Amino acid sequence: MDADVVVVGAGLAGLVAAAELADAGRRVIILDQEPAASVGGQAFWSFGGLMFVDSPEQRRLRVHDSPELALADWLGSAGFDRPEDYWPRQWAEGYVEFAAGEKRAWLARQGMRWFPIVQWAERGGYGVSASGAHGNSVPRFHLTWGTGPGVLEPFLRRVRTAVDNGTIELRFRHRVTALATHDGAVTGVTGETLAPSNVPRGVRSTREVVGDFAVGAQAVIVASGGIGGNHELVRRNWPASWGAAPTHMISGVPDHVDGAMLGVTERAGGRVINADRMWHYPEGILNHSPVWTAHGIRILSGPSPLWLDPGGERLPPPLFPGFDSLGALRHITGAGYDYSWLVLDRRTLSTEFALSGSEQNPDLTGKDIRQVIGRARGGPTGPVQAFLDRGPDFVVRPTVAELAKGMNELTGTDLIDAKTLRRLVQARDQQVSSGLGKDPQVVATAAARRYIGDRLTRIVRPHRFLDASGDPLVAVRCHVLTRKTLGGLETDLSARVLRSDGQPLPGVYAAGEAAGFGGGGVHGYRALEGTFLGGCLFSGRIAGRAAAAAVA
């Protein structure tokens, strides 16, 4: 044997698993098809949000959370309704217990810290029923100080220490194409060696094959990510209930997120479940400085902007920004569209627009307290201003008529009627001016401002978009942005990959997005956010510890 365990994928889940294996004294080889510059995978590019339950940060903000409430929110959002959801549901229960228990202390011991204001993602808005409902009842999205790189740092440090002492070996440009088996058990991997590449992180690397390889091991952990960079696979798995898959989508993940290892593991006997469950965003914008193919960025908007379909009609309640990502996506694509509009004024944008991603938040990523405090002075952040100035999806005009004209020019259509758009904005402004209002979005926004975190940093003071200040109006074309795979390799609570007969595939484990973040789909149909990095941490830790025990 070349190693005790082979880990396929040098993203967050793979690094966590490898670090746990090394701590247990196991010899590990990590294989990844990308160059060394891309170590950390998708997690590097992330905003660094983590879900905690009843955290010190929540309590300081007078947010009352509990494991029982979090699990009710999770199950209401997941909507588990299939026989295949047996293991995903158990993983969900375990994850909520982890998020309410040792998760924060475990990460804090490794040096991780969090921004003091907890964000409120996926607010739901469908009301409460006996069967539950989607959304976070309270804010739970904790921003890691350092964003995605800050989440990676402790595990990269542990892995590099193990590399230095000879416990772990990192082999980049190694693409696994098969799991090696003997007498029904997996005994390692085989694959192709790719040509060296010095492209920067995230840039598409060459797929030129220069050789082949084989690595023998007692166990293999598949931590290779999902399918978000492979639009062909996304369309193949697109559920009919969402309408036809869009002909045009943009990518929220690099090209290497291709889903290839799911097929490799299936061919060896592993079972993929819930492949039609995915988590794509309807608020994607084209990056003015793209790194990968069709590079898109997600807008993290507060709830005040009007959300319109391509014909200028408002999305129905509660499909407001930040309330129900899947509901909004399904409404848009179900009507045959592949884009929508956010309409607001510049004052609202300055407070309510943030951008997802480590590179779009250099103050938080760089741990620059002075820059973070500078956000309170008002005005858009530097990255948001860059999109206002250079973003191909932004239309900024002084009047409604000119805004409508610009929207039509951008799309090459005449779908937006200026008079109808003016009436819509005026009707919204009347509701805001009343001080109370009956419009569901105005009411929901006022309710959200009761939370001090939103009132201080996230939601602008209610005001008319068409007022005497002369503030310009903004329309943003939002594309469908591919991102996460919610289904994946079915695993038991020890992260062992299961066969179609429900028995473990000997010697194979899976973690992270490749395993649907646990069990083959821990989120069900919908996520609460802050749970993808967390799912990689949780499942990677379990896989590493379980494999270490199995090869002892």
Sequence positions of predicted segments:
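Conserved redox-cofactor binding core of oxidoreductases
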Residues: A92-F213, H231-E232, I285, V425-R461, ...
